[in-house]
Amino acid sequence: VNTVVSSNFIDKVRFRASAQTTANLSPHLFLKGYAAYGVRDKKWKYEGEVEYSFLKKQYSPEEFPRNSIAISTRYDVMAPSDAMLPTDKDNVFTSLKTQTIDQMSYFRQYNIRYVYEFDNHFGITAQLRHITQNPTGTLFYRTVGGQIVPELTQSEATLSLRYAPGEKVVVTKQRRHPVNHNYPIYTLMHTTGFKDV
């Protein structure tokens, strides 16, 4: 509900409708996505994801442990700082800002992710991602030599190892939330990029 209406510099007012399936439809196959429309730029934005869980789930694909593969695509507009938000970037409360954020970019992303979690809270995530970004608003990309670049493209592979002994979480429809912070979480991650892909 808190993402139905929001605002940013490019969209001005933004309307969004989201949907996702639960294990009530299928205990292995999960779909989720959204469609959003910006009143100022008159562009549709979207995200769609298909996730297959090799383990039977009671309600959500986020339930522990995970053994799943997901494929997603997304086209949207965002500020560079939106990638660091702990919540959804379309949360209506993120629209309340003390100053105008007008450096934004349209981005198109394709993602394949595999997650495997062991009973001892050790997990492995492997991911392939391709992103194209086009600056908008007052944002621009320039080479060291001063040439304006119309878009940035990055293709990358990430391998992440995570160990969270004693971790307890609450699973919501979209994500997990830790309920205890008494134990350490160890994460080792490596990302490598591919040139000219």
Residue ranges, per PLM feature:
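Exposed, low-structure sequence patches enriched in small/polar residues
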Residues: 1-197
